[in-house]
Amino acid sequence: SGAAVAAGLVTCALGTDTGGSVRGPAHNSGIVGLKPTFGRVSRHGVIPLSWSLDHVGPMTRTVKDCILLLNAIEGYDDTDPYSVSMDPINIDINGNFDLHGKTIGIFTAFTEDILSKDVEINIQRVLDSFKSLGVNIIEIGLDQLSKSEAQQGPILYDIIVGPESAAYHYTNMEENIDSYGNHPRRRLE
């Protein structure tokens, strides 16, 4: 989907993001991908990987298109038990909004081990641009979280996703094992 958006084959696409399946393709294709707040967009009709972590999100070529698509798909849905009633996101898509006095938090804990120098430089450029618009930038660390605890994140992800996806797919896999490709089958078995 991300490649189709980037190539101009489609104006937009929806994806499901549990561990990066909207944000990763967006990053790799140079497009906009958004993982909305949990419960903002209904997941009714989506085959789950993990019902407690799945998000439906837009992929577009521009931020403006992303806002338009998000506005079209967000909202409470009583057919999704995890849907939450939230105020809609109201952003002036013409860019006529004032960021002065707004605050952005940037997570800095342990990033020195995972960011390349180029990424660090680009993040700093973006932060400098925000600062020039009057945005307050605050660093968010996890002082109480040790590095070893933070590295357990992927393990905890697997502890949640594995059983949830297996529970959903168990019956179908028993009856239609050949309908699953090698990678999904290995992941679920």
Spans of features found by a protein language model:
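Short helix-loop capping/hinge segments that flank enzyme active sites or metal/cofactor-binding pockets
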Residues: 98-107, 159-189
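Conserved active-site and cofactor/substrate-binding residues in soluble primary-metabolism enzymes
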Residues: 16, 26-29, 61-68, 99, ...
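Active-site-proximal alpha-helical scaffold in enzymes
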Residues: 1-27, 59-63, 67-70
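A short helix-breaking turn/cap at a secondary-structure junction
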Residues: 35-121, 175-176
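Short connector loops at secondary-structure junctions
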Residues: 105, 135-157
